[in-house]
């Protein structure tokens, strides 16, 4: 449950045009949005309709300006409208938007992913959901098995079989699963607590020779931010292989965000299959999955496991993604770490001064705030926090010109575009935000 801010905390900015356009949107779009978290459902108040972004800033259609700490939920690692990415997109678009045929850009982007990670072959798709859906299908086809093991609070896109205990998307609405996901769809999905190797071993013992794969976020970012405990991902791979199953590591969020090599660069664990998105897209609809060459060889047209897409490998998206990855050189990541350290330091200082119990959940450059004492290690821990403090905290930041994810269960993302002036704006907004969190009342 969340404590909704009182009326004095909501919409002190002029948001009349956002309200008008949002009302217009609700007439033609369910809930007025095309992804639920954008509706401000868990924090209340008027969702902002964004007009443009540049560097570290966003502007809504009413002219309100914000420091951007959402980064489009991860892709905008270089900030908004980076000139090199914009130029690459414009050049590619001028040559044609889509051909339904092979292009050079597909191979260039795939080569770049292979060069920086442990995957040997790559298939390009349009979204993270497509990537995880296809990776699971491939794992089932390769192993000849049906069951999939996933973790509570880990989100792998809106795939029916993976929406059980799926974290932020459904947690925002306090729904354990999505209506429309049938029992048959989820019947082969086994769900266990995150960071619990004993539960994983018990699941394999209960279903010997039946589990096709384990799928896990390389570091969880959809129950808030929860890093895997030391050795967790390596143990998952060992357990899976001992039973003839595969390990799928979902790096849609962590890939090329947490290090030059993604989470693989942090713990050195190579998934048999790995999914990528967000940063790899540069902000356009693109994603990928890849892995061991022998596994990928089962994918059509080389093998019998079917996967296809009219717009997969779209040349404009390939240009955007390649430009994004080329900018994300090894020198970028220490700067991102510095920005994350500086930001979390300011948050801790403000919340501590206001007497608010909290813990900063970190996974390298990704983080979230747990409004409780101590670190959360799984979804139950994150749900047990004082999440009702988040909505007043969020709105005070928004009024102070700082745009953060509108859910206690979403991860915050820094960009390389943040400036000293941005941190001054953030610091000024954090004091009233911390006070708002401190004065929040637990819902009855």
From Swiss-Prot:
PROSITE patterns on file: AA_TRANSFER_CLASS_3
Keyword DNA-binding on entry: no
Subunit record text: Homodimer.
InterPro entries assigned to the protein according to its UniProt record, in alphabetical order: 4pyrrol_synth_GluAld_NH2Trfase, Aminotrans_3, Aminotrans_3_PPA_site, PyrdxlP-dep_Trfase, PyrdxlP-dep_Trfase_major, PyrdxlP-dep_Trfase_small
Native organism: Corynebacterium aurimucosum (strain ATCC 700975 / DSM 44827 / CIP 107346 / CN-1) (Corynebacterium nigricans)
Top-level taxon of origin: Bacteria
Biological process terms in GO annotation: protoporphyrinogen IX biosynthetic process
Alphabetical UniProt keywords: Cytoplasm, Isomerase, Porphyrin biosynthesis, Pyridoxal phosphate
Localization (cell): Cytoplasm
Record pathway: Porphyrin-containing compound metabolism; protoporphyrin-IX biosynthesis; 5-aminolevulinate from L-glutamyl-tRNA(Glu): step 2/2
Residues recorded as bearing N6-(pyridoxal phosphate)lysine in the entry: 278
Similarity comment: Belongs to the class-III pyridoxal-phosphate-dependent aminotransferase family. HemL subfamily.
Cofactor(s) needed: pyridoxal 5'-phosphate
Coarse class of the protein's main subcellular location: cytoplasm
Keyword Isomerase attached: yes
Catalytic activities: (S)-4-amino-5-oxopentanoate = 5-aminolevulinate
Gene Ontology cellular-component terms listed: cytoplasm
Pfam families: Aminotran_3 (PF00202)
EC number(s) given by UniProt: 5.4.3.8
GO MF assignments: glutamate-1-semialdehyde 2,1-aminomutase activity; pyridoxal phosphate binding; transaminase activity
The name this protein goes by in its record: Glutamate-1-semialdehyde 2,1-aminomutase
HAMAP family with a match to the protein in the record: HemL_aminotrans_3 (MF_00375)
């Amino acid at each position: 449950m969340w404590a909704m801010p009182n009326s004095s905390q909501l919409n002190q900015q002029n948001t009349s045009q956002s309200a008008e356009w949002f009302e217009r949107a609700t007439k033609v779009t369910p809930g007025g949005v095309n992804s639920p978290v954008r509706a401000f459902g868990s924090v209340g108040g008027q969702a902002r309709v964004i007009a443009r972004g540049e560097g570290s800033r966003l502007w809504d259609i009413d002219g309100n300006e914000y420091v951007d700490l959402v980064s489009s939920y991860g892709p905008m690692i270089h900030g908004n409208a980076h000139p090199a990415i914009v130029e690459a997109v414009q050049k590619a678009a001028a040559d044609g938007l889509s051909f339904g045929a092979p292009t050079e850009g597909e191979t260039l982007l795939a080569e770049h992913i292979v060069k920086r990670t442990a995957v040997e072959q790559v298939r390009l798709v349009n979204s993270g959901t497509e990537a995880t859906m296809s990776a699971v299908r491939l794992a089932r086809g390769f192993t000849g098995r049906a069951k999939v093991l996933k973790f509570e609070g880990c989100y792998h896109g809106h795939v029916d079989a993976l929406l059980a205990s799926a974290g932020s998307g459904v947690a925002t609405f306090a729904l354990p699963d999505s209506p429309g996901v049938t029992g048959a769809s989820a019947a082969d999905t086994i769900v266990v607590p995150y960071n619990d190797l004993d539960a994983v071993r018990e699941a394999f013992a209960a279903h010997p020779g039946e589990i096709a794969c384990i799928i896990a976020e390389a570091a969880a970012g959809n129950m808030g931010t929860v890093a895997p405990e030391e050795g967790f991902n390596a143990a998952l791979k060992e357990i899976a292989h001992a039973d003839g199953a595969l390990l799928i590591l979902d790096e849609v969020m962590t890939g090329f965000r947490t290090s030059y090599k993604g989470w693989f660069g942090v713990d050195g664990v190579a998934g048999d299959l790995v999914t990528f998105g967000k940063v790899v897209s540069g902000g356009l609809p693109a994603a990928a999955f890849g892995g061991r060459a022998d596994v990928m060889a089962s994918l059509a047209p080389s093998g019998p496991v079917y996967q296809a897409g009219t717009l997969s490998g779209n040349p404009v998206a390939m240009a955007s993604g390649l430009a994004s990855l080329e900018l994300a050189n090894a020198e970028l990541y220490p700067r991102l770490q510095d920005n994350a350290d500086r930001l979390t330091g300011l948050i801790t200082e403000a919340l501590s001064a206001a007497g608010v119990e909290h813990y900063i959940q970190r996974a390298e450059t990704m983080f979230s705030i747990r409004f409780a004492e101590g670190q959360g290690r799984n979804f139950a821990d994150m749900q047990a926090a004082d999440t009702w403090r988040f909505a007043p905290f969020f709105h005070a930041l928004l009024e102070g010109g700082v745009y953060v994810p509108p859910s206690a269960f979403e991860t915050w993302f820094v960009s390389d575009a943040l400036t000293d002036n941005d941190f001054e704006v953030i610091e000024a907004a954090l004091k009233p935000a911390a006070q708002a969190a401190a004065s929040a009342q637990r819902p009855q």
